[in-house]
Every structure is written in C-alpha cells, then in structure tokens.
Amino acid sequence: NSNNHSVLGDWVWAQPEDKVTTIFEGVSKIGKSKGYNVDFYDSNEDIRSISDIDIKRTVNYARNYDQIVVVVGDNSQRNLKSKRTAGENMGRANLNLSGKQLQLVKKLRQVNKDVIVVYVNGKPIAEPWIDKNISGVVESWESGTTAGTAVAEVLFGDMNPGGKLPLTFPRSVGQLQMIYNHKPSQYFHKYAFEKVTPLYPFGHGLSYSNFEYSEFVVSEVVNDKISISVDVTNDSEFDGEEVVQLYFRDSYSSVTRPVKELVRYKRVVIASGETKTIDFHLDIKDLAFYDINMNLCV
C-alpha cells in the first residue's frame, strides 16, 4: 500500500500517476530534503498473495536500513477487482489484516524494534499485537490524493497530529457488545479469552504532545444553563493541538441512557508548557431525552 493508489479508497476510478502522491512518494520527497536515504520495497502488489518467500525477501532487504516504515491495511480500489480486500460488495468475516500482513510486521519487528506501522483502511483494523509491540502506529485512513504528503509530515514531525477516532476499534470481531448504551448498573459478562474494553475507544488519538487535565469545574444551573471549565496543560516540548471532549452520563434515569455521550468538543492549540482554560456552555435541553412515553424530558 505504500506506493499505490489505495489511499483513494472505493468509488474512485483509476487516476493519472501525477495526480496522486503515494505514501512512499511523500516520505521520499520530505525525507530526501532532510538528508535521508529513502527507499521502497514492494512485498507484493496483491495483499492477498503475500507469501513466506515475499516476507523473507522483504526482511532481508530491510536489514540494511536504520528505520522501517511498513504500510499495511486494505485495498478497496474499484479497478483492481480480484485484488480488493475491502469496499462495496466486499464483505469481511474478521477485522484482522488480510493475508500475511501481520506476519510481515512481526518479522520486520524482529530485525528492527523501531518499526512504524501506517494503516491504509476504510474500517477498523483489530490487531492487538501491533498495538502492544509496535512503538508507532499512524492511522491514515483512505485520505485522498495528497495522503502521502500528510503521512510524511507526521512521520518526520513537520506536523503534530491531533485527530481523534470517530468510531470504536474492537479487539476482535467477536467483541460484539462494543457499545455505549448498556445499563450503567451492569456492563456485560466477561469473555473467557478476551478483554471487555475496546482496542481503541471512540475519541482516542495521540500526538507528539502530552496534555494533562486539571481543575474541572461544573457550575450550578442558572436560567437552564450550565457552565463547565477545565484546565489543559501541554507538559511536553512540542506545541500541539488537543481536541478537548466533554462527555455526559446520566447516572439515574427512568430509561437506559448512554454511559458515554459526547455533548461538546473544542480543538485548541496549546504551546509547550502552556495551560489553557477551556470553557463549555450547555443548555439544559442539550441533556434532554425521550422517556418511556416518548415525552422529551430532562
């Protein structure tokens, strides 16, 4: 996926080469401008067909380099037909990496512990081993014609990422109850061989900065309005952007309410060492819900 048009996703026909910046092209351009020797090795243009021989050859090639970036995920290009692993009319029975991509990552990790994984995908990928053993994972999605430039800027630190997940990543396809509207009095029974928490929850996302939250204050209700504030400190050496998220939970209700409901968020730029007070303002109606008789109430 590092040097093809999988970054375009489904429902996009074949594009001219000069109209799309692949991930390799983006990394190569920025890397060479910084004095790095950047090279590319294609394990197999068909994700489904990566073989043990392909993996062995890739690993032998990678031994000569100080840093390895492996691009894995799905390929939903409509014009590829039999080589597609995702997209419309391409159902999947699991959320794992297709073929032997995980084995490829594991073998590369054996020769270089600083492997970075870049995902190109249009759906969640459930690979707990990668989360546990790989030091850096970039979720690039199918981000379009300039995806290569965007990914390269993140990898080289020219851009400090600050995105948050718009959905939940379960640990496996069997983690069916990965929901936020179960009864607050009881989550659900434990799995025999699986954790009950997701691999990555809704709203998760890391950056090169580290943000600490403190001084959370909720005002009294005045004229059906509530004010909430929280101090956010960037205690890292990097200026960064943080998406401050405000969630609401109704602990006692006549009907089952979500245990985690996003009601407000703000994206803020916070310099290294800086503390900002973030204010949210809610109307009571923002917390309203329909009761058992379908009447709107708070």
Where are these regions (language model features)?
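C-terminal non-catalytic regions of proteins with extracellular/luminal or membrane-system context
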Residues: N1-V298
